[in-house]
Curated annotation (Swiss-Prot):
Purpose of the protein: Catalyzes the formation of the alpha-1,6-glucosidic linkages in glycogen by scission of a 1,4-alpha-linked oligosaccharide from growing alpha-1,4-glucan chains and the subsequent attachment of the oligosaccharide to the alpha-1,6 position.
Protein's UniProt name: 1,4-alpha-glucan branching enzyme GlgB
Single GO cellular component term: cytosol
Keywords: Carbohydrate metabolism, Glycogen biosynthesis, Glycogen metabolism, Glycosyltransferase, Transferase
Amino acid sequence: MSEPMSERERWQLELDKLQRGLQGDPFAFLGPQRDADGEGGVLRAYLPGAQRVELLDEDGATLAELEQSDPGSGLFQHHLERLPARYRLRTHWPDGVQESEDPYAFGPLLGELDLYLFAEGNHRQLASCLGAQLTRHEGVDGVRFAVWAPNAVRVSVVGDFNGWDGRRHPMRRRYPSGVWELFIPRLGAGELYKYELQGHAGLLPLKADPLALACETPPGTASKTCAALRHEWRDQDWLARRAERQGYAAPLSIYEVHAGSWRHRDGRPPRWSELAEELIPYVRQLGFSHIELMPVMEHPFGGSWGYQPLGLFAPTARYGTPEDFAGFVDACHQAGIGVILDWVPAHFPTDAHGLGRFDGTALYEYEHPFEGFHQDWDTYIYNLGRSEVHGFMLASALHWLRTYHVDGLRVDAVASMLYRDYSRKEGEWLPNRHGGRENLEAIDFLHHLNQVVASETPGALVIAEESTAWPGVSRPVAEGGLGFSHKWNMGWMHDSLAYIGEDPLHRRYHHHQLTFGLLYAFSEHFILPISHDEVVHGKHSLLDKMPGDRWQKFANLRLYLSFMWSHPGKKLLFMGCEFGQWREWNHDGELDWYLLRYPEHQGVQDLVATLNRLYHELPALHARDGEALGFEWLIGDDQANSVYAWLRHAAGEPSLLAVHNFTPVPRQGYRIGVPQGGDWDVLLNSDAQAYAGSGAGSQGRVASEPAGAHGQAQSLLLELPPLGTLLLRPAG
């Protein structure tokens, strides 16, 4: 049997752990260590590089000087007959003197309920629990750090405040949660920090805080201490009416924006305050109801457009502070504009400072690459079957909805979440526990997400970008659906863009591409999306997709937008499409605003403003977007002339007639049946000179005739403009 270690041998062993960065239980050795009698004891501080350390009472009087155990060891200690209840350390460094309370004199920080809820995956306020929280603890101001790393041997907080030395601030492990915590007194806002983790296989790259509330401006990758948001909100009226404004019967017209490339200031991306000054009035002028921001969560690579985020709780520092972002959202609401954020729970990038192999193991991601690595995007896939990861992502969603008052989340890449074999060949994926291809863990998460959002942030939207035929995406969970409020209609987008890209001479052979979408238009609560994805990577801008010469391109664009706005479904249009930008979108530049000097571009912009005005003013265009009763075909079979016509209905409101001519041939005397006799007003002619069109087609008022057509007793004899749309309703 070996001899028991002497006291010196024991602390030499502990010192060796500290010096080698292997001390996983610093509170058992550092700070006040009481003698067996409970009165006196040893007070230890490990401060490598310090020259002297004085022990002060709470009033600042010197009680003793701590002795360095061995010269240069960095371990300072002193035995006292009575350990003080409160004390401070005055540390003499080569470049100055620092006075502060001892981090290792404080008791545990997080409560058992917090740790239980986190482990359960149901801590709804995780953003105020883990991460770096400015707080007052045991009467002392400072920052409480907490991070989940259950498989780490040791975790330390490092930053400018300790010279990025991982030996200075090792953290306390809380069993069994795997959370590490430490309170650093007198630390404030604006400090850069990361976590240094010792894994079982050695030291890991410094990690940013997964729950950081603010981050360093890229290309820097550090987290930043940040006070809890103290914005004085003035959007109470908006929030009180939000559920009504965002209901299925309300008009929803979304302007999709990449904040950094909408409009530059002095050759640089804008700040949130500048966007509030310029973007909000612009959106109001054009009549959009909402702004959808491409991801503003902190992301290391600007070229990902935000779709590879690592700071799931922090607005990117590229455009300002968290307070600046809150001010932007508040200003939108006061102007009557909703804010939707793109949010990415499907995958995350492999940057060394990020979530991947966070504690030396596959913590946030699946272990097996067939489950945990996305080959198309070179990213990791969240293991949403792990309760802590499930709860982390749920808390992120709630953080944006509650803390920043955003009105909805557009969930990116839902299809990749639903299927284990998404974009994988045979033999490159693992089946679920039933042998199927569905990702049951992700489905459970989406169910939970949508139920919690509906319960805790009533009226908020959760929109799915989902490109497959998965049934019931926007059906309530209780009815067997995924529970989203809306789904992007990717099928409509692909078919309609393919059709409009055809030469008008050939469109008769593709007539079904516009009629097919109306077979399933009411199976979900759809949004018609013309998003950023359609104007990049060689796909051409929306204007440049149009066939023909310059005149035909603009006429086709005006026709396409008019077709879209009169079609069932809410609307989404990416910035630049509203005035017909020629070039593809470039995230490093700004939109080509100079084009608005030309009448054709100004005409497209004016048309979009008119379409939004009509869409909001006329219930027939929005009140029954998701109901078959709100739509009635009149002409869906005029393949020879590429003409389509339908009625839109709303209860107790006049019907609206939409007629589209997809050829450059004016159609004189084109008869269309209508449900009501008398005069009909032409509300819109997309070829009107007001929109830089040719001025052809019916204008003003048209009288009906008692000649039956298309199953209606009355009809109108119209002049259809070339490559144009007419919108009409009964006069009066």
